[in-house]
Amino acid sequence: MHVKKGDTVVVITGKDKGKKGKVLQVLPKKNRVIVEGVAMVTKHQKPNQQMQQGGRIEQEAAIDASNVMIWDKKANQGVRVGYKLENGKKVRVSKKTGEVID
C-alpha cells in the first residue's frame, strides 16, 4: 500500500473531499485506511466495564486507500507515490518533488 500508519493524507473523493488527517490504522487485506477526523460515523455503545455511561459515540470509519493521497508539505498538495532503491532499501518517493517520504 502507498500509505503507512502516521502519514498525513488528503481525501480526494467522497463527502470528506479536501480534508487532511493522519492515518490511524491501515487495513491492507481490505485495502482500506482509517484517517483521523474523516468519515465520522455514530456508533451506539452499550454500557460496559470501560465505558460505564454508554450512549452514542462518534468514531472514524475506514475508507478505501485509493481515495487518499499523501500530503507533501513542500508541494503543499497531495502527491502520488513512487518507489526507488536507496542503499539497498526500497523507499517511497514523491512523484511531484522527487523527495524521499520516509
UniProtKB/Swiss-Prot annotation:
SUPFAM superfamilies (alphabetical): Translation proteins SH3-like domain (SSF50104)
Family matches, as Gene3D superfamilies: 2.30.30.30
GO biological process: translation
Domain of life: Bacteria
Coiled-coil intervals, chain numbering: none
Keywords carried by this UniProt record: Ribonucleoprotein, Ribosomal protein, RNA-binding, rRNA-binding
PROSITE patterns named in the record: RIBOSOMAL_L24
UniProt cross-references to InterPro entries, sorted A to Z: KOW, Rib_uL2_dom2, Ribosomal_uL24, Ribosomal_uL24_CS, Ribosomal_uL24_KOW, Translation_prot_SH3-like_sf
Classification via Pfam families: KOW, ribosomal_L24
A molecular function GO annotation: structural constituent of ribosome
Keyword Secreted assigned: no
Family annotation (SMART domains): KOW (SM00739)
GO cellular component: ribonucleoprotein complex; ribosome
Protein purpose: One of two assembly initiator proteins, it binds directly to the 5'-end of the 23S rRNA, where it nucleates assembly of the 50S subunit.
Known partners and oligomeric status: Part of the 50S ribosomal subunit.
Recorded family membership: Belongs to the universal ribosomal protein uL24 family.
Name listed for the protein in its UniProt record: Large ribosomal subunit protein uL24
Gene from which the chain derives: rplX
